Structures are given as C-alpha cells and as structure tokens.
Amino acid sequence: MNNQTTIGILGSGTWGIALARLLHRNGHDVTVWSRSPKKIENLSATRTHPALPGLVIPETVHFTCDLQTVASGKDILLFAVPSIAIRQTAESARPFIPLIPYIFRVSLRMTWSS
C-alpha cells in the first residue's frame, strides 16, 4: 500500500520549485504546473530553475501545463502563483478541485499599496 501524499503545485517560479523539491525530499509525490509549455519543457529537460542556481530538481518531480493533471486526484493543492494571477488560476482550476481536502495559497511576500 502506498501512503505517499500526492501534492499539486500551481506555479513553477522559485517558490513553487523550492517547495516541490522540499516536499519531494520528504517523501511526497509532487506535480508542478505552469501555464507556459516552454517553461515546463525547459524544467523537464534541465531539471533546474534559472533563478535557483545549484538546485537540482529530482527526476521524479512531475511537470505539466495541464490544470486537470496537476489538480485531479491530489491530496493537497498549493497555489504558488503570483498574487495577480491567483484569481484567474483558481477559476481555471475550479472544475478539477472540488474534492481536494486541503488547498493552500503560499506566498513569499505581500505588497501593500497606499
């Protein structure tokens, strides 16, 4: 029996990739999503992120630009997209996430406007 937690990460920026690597190293099955097929192709081919020198992404971290693939059947879903994209991404992913027990929004920083 496989007790591995399946985690989908929406966002393939530095925060999404760092979380993917950390969660994978802790024994979880991780899939990372980006809306950019070119970015997914590059991440899959190089297993590195240009803004994270020296960090190698394990071969068993999965990449996709398909929202259904990243969200369907996951135990946990993390939104690691920029704040400006959260609403659009959530609306696009909505058909695939109604039964996921845990959904989180992760952020590196908050910006405030006056």
Task: Label every PLM stretch briefly.
Residues M1-V56, V61-C65, E91-S92:
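NAD(P)+-binding Rossmann beta1-loop-alpha1 motif at the extreme N-terminus of oxidoreductases
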Residues Q68:
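Acidic phosphotransfer microenvironment of two-component signaling modules
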Residues A71-S72, I76-S114:
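Rossmann-like NAD(P)(H) cofactor-binding subdomain of soluble oxidoreductases
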